[in-house]
Amino acid sequence: MQSIVPYHTYEYGDQPEVIATVPGRFHLLGEHLWFAQGDALSVAIDKTLQLSVSRRPDNNFRVYSVSLDDRRRISSTNMRYRKEDRWVNSVKIVIASFFDHGISVSGLNFTVLSEIPSDASLGTPNALKVATGLVLRQLFAPNLTLLELADIIEYANIQGLTSYGHRADIYTALFAKAGTCIRTEYKKKTVIHCAFPPEGYSIILTDSKIPRSIAREELGLALRDCIDAYEFVKKLPDAPKNMHNLTEAFLQESDIPEAVKRRVTYVIRESAAIDTAIKALESGDNQSFVRLIARSQEGLRDRFEISAPELDWLVKRTNELAKNEPDSFVCARLTGKGFGGCTYSILKDEQIPLFTDKMADYERFFGLLPQQYTVKSADGAVVQVLQ
């Protein structure tokens, strides 16, 4: 990735003091379980966002996005979320969260340079929030632990955006290691690393290019239905106090709507899949891992109902490449919010051209031109101090 320093210097006339480089990410399993405090299995990718910063003589903030060619000014007296501020809200809410935690922050010049594909559910807003937190920590709160910083960023999401994204977004950006996937243990606030993918396999991310404007409202309604179903079961008189002990047998024996059973069954199965997936990866049990991914995709399509024909098509084309190979690690699933965004495909290196060739059919069927990225698992965020 090109250096951010010349852009910052040209824009503000001074050298940056601190640069944070944060990876994008995708989720293998579990990203939709945040409301159930479930774990997630994720991968940081070698597409990054850089954020540089230098001090100002006042208490205001300027933010320049190289990628968007957009410049914004932020007043220290107005840190509330505003829809019209769009991407810069990610910076504002983290600064506000530092204020709310009693940490003084003086005026700064920010420059943003990102190579993470936008609008593809690969973590661009999350990377900007984490990068903002890291540079503020370096300048104003160096004694903060990374776990404490993660809490501040999560607070920013909840208070600033009224958003409850999975804690795994933040933990993956901070704690990932190259050559591994990372399990975020939601309740414990800990992580586990596991080698991923196996040797000889590559990760292909395919952006479906489904317009977000079309999907956003439908996605919101679907997620609301899933959360309501879980809360409905949680309030049943004989529901277990610890919902992690909830079983499919309990659902089948309960007099509850079928739609509720269907959605909560997905939560139970996806939660269990995280444990099984780690064991499969550690033991080299490719078949078990591939079955888990296929079952998760089926659940997102049929139980959570947040897939789309375009995503299903991409998954199916991947799985076709694994036919007659019983020990293959080839698998695919949607990743992120759903109703659009990306799928990930784990393919043998020699299968990549075969998969890429199928994209002409995708364009013909759906009238959309997909974008593909071959990525590698990457390390978590890095902070560089220049002055």
Regions found by a protein language model. Give the residues of each.
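Gly/Ser-rich oxyanion-binding loop with an adjacent helix/lid
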Residues: M1-A20, H32-D39, E84-P197, K358, ...
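C-terminal nucleotide
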Residues: M1-L29, Q50-N89, T180-R333, I346-Q387
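Short Gly/aromatic-enriched secondary-structure transition segments
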Residues: Q37-A44, A222-L223
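Short catalytic helix/loop segments, enriched in acidic residues and glycine
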Residues: A44-Q50
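A structural signal for short, well-ordered beta-strand segments
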Residues: F110-V112, T206-S208, T343
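Short, mixed-charge aromatic SLiMs
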Residues: P117-S121, I153-S163, D228-K235, R301-D302, ...
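Short beta-strand->loop micro-motif that forms the acidic, two-metal-ion catalytic signature
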Residues: G340-I346
